[in-house]
C-alpha cells in the first residue's frame, strides 16, 4: 500500500545525505530556512489569533491553526529541512541499511542546530520590525508561550510524541496522493490537527519562545522555561519519528 511513498522517503533521505556530504553549510542553511518558514507561520498564526483572543472569542485557536498551516507548505515546496520530519526519513532509511546510524545522528544534530539558529535569527528580524510591540498584538503569542511552559515534562513528552506522529504523516501521506490540490489540503489538515489539539512541536516552540523572549514579556516567560519545554518535547518528537513512523513502516513493509 505504501510502497511508492516509502521509496520516496528513502530517496529524500539519501538526497539529504548527499547534500550534507557535499556541503555541510548548504545542509545547515536549508535547516535554517525551515525554521524561518515556521517563524512566518507562527507570526501569522499569533497575529490572527490575537484578534479573536482579545475579544475572548473561542475561535482564537482555530483561526491560528488554519493560518499556521502555511508554514508546512513553505517547507515542503520552499526547500527547508526540518528536524522533526528527518526523524522519520533517516530512521526508515537506516533500518533499510541504506544509511549508517552514525550519519543519521550527524544529520539529526545538524538539522536541529540549523533549526535553532533559524528560529533565533527570525526572532531577531521580527522583533526589529516592531510589529509585536503592542500588547493587543502579542498577547496571544505570550499566552501560547506561557501555556507551553506550564505542563510537567511527562505530559510534554507525550504531546511531542503525538505531534510529530501527525507532522510526519503530513509529509508522508501526500506522497501517495495525486494532484497538488489534494497534497496541499492534506498537509494543512494534518498541521491543523496537531495545532488545535494542543500537541507540542519542538521547532515551532523554538520560534514561539525566541520571539516571546525578545519582545516585552511577563516574568512567567523565561529562558529556563523554554529549555524545560524543549527537552521533553524534542525527545517526544524523536520517539514518534523513530518508533511510530520509521520502525512501524519498516515492520509493516518487510519486503520493501
Swiss-Prot record:
The chain crosses the membrane at residues 32-52, 59-79, 112-132, 156-176, 184-204, 207-227, 230-250. NCBIfam families: fnt. InterPro entries: Aquaporin-like, For/NO2_transpt, For/NO2_transpt_CS. It is found in: Cell membrane. It comes from Bacillus subtilis (strain 168). It holds the Pfam family Form_Nir_trans. It comes from the Bacteria. One of its GO terms (molecular function) is formate transmembrane transporter activity. GO terms for cellular component: plasma membrane. The gene is ywcJ. Its main location: membrane. This is Uncharacterized transporter YwcJ. GO terms for biological process: formate transport. It is a multi-pass membrane protein. Belongs to the FNT transporter (TC 1.A.16) family. Keywords: Cell membrane, Membrane, Transmembrane, Transmembrane helix, Transport. The keyword Membrane applies.
Amino acid at each position: 500500500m505504501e510502497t511508492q511513498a516509502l521509496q520516496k522517503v528513502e530517496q529524500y533521505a539519501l538526497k539529504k545525505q548527499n547534500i550534507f556530504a557535499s556541503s555541510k553549510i548548504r545542509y545547515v542553511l536549508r535547516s535554517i530556512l525551515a525554521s524561518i518558514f515556521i517563524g512566518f507561520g507562527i507570526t501569522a498564526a499569533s497575529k490572527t489569533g490575537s484578534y479573536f483572543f482579545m475579544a475572548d472569542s473561542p475561535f482564537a485557536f482555530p483561526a491560528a491553526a488554519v493560518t499556521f498551516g502555511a508554514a508546512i507548505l513553505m517547507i515542503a515546496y520552499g526547500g527547508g529541512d526540518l528536524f522533526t520530519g528527518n526523524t522519520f526519513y533517516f530512521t526508515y532509511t537506516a533500518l533499510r541499511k541504506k544509511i549508517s546510524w552514525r550519519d543519521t545522528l550527524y544529520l539529526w544534530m545538524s538539522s536541529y542546530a540549523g533549526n535553532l539558529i533559524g528560529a533565533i535569527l527570525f526572532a531577531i528580524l521580527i522583533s526589529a520590525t516592531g510589529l509585536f510591540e503592542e500588547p493587543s498584538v502579542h498577547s496571544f503569542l505570550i499566552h501560547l508561550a506561557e501555556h507551553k511552559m506550564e505542563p510537567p515534562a511527562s505530559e510534554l513528552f507525550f504531546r511531542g510524541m503525538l505531534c510529530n506522529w501527525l507532522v510526519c504523516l503530513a509529509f508522508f501521506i501526500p506522497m501517495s496522493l495525486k494532484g497538488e490540490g489534494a497534497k496541499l489540503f492534506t498537509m494543512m489538515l494534518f498541521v491543523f490537527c496537531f495545532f488545535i489539539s494542543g500537541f507540542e512541536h519542538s521547532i515551532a516552540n523554538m520560534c514561539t519562545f525566541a520571539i516571546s523572549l525578545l519582545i516585552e514579556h511577563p516574568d512567567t516567560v523565561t529562558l529556563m522555561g523554554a529549555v524545560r519545554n524543549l527537552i521533553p518535547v524534542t525527545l517526544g518528537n524523536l520517539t514518534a519519528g523513530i518508533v511510530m513512523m520509521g520502525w512501524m513502516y519498516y515492520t509493516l513493509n518487510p519486503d520493501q
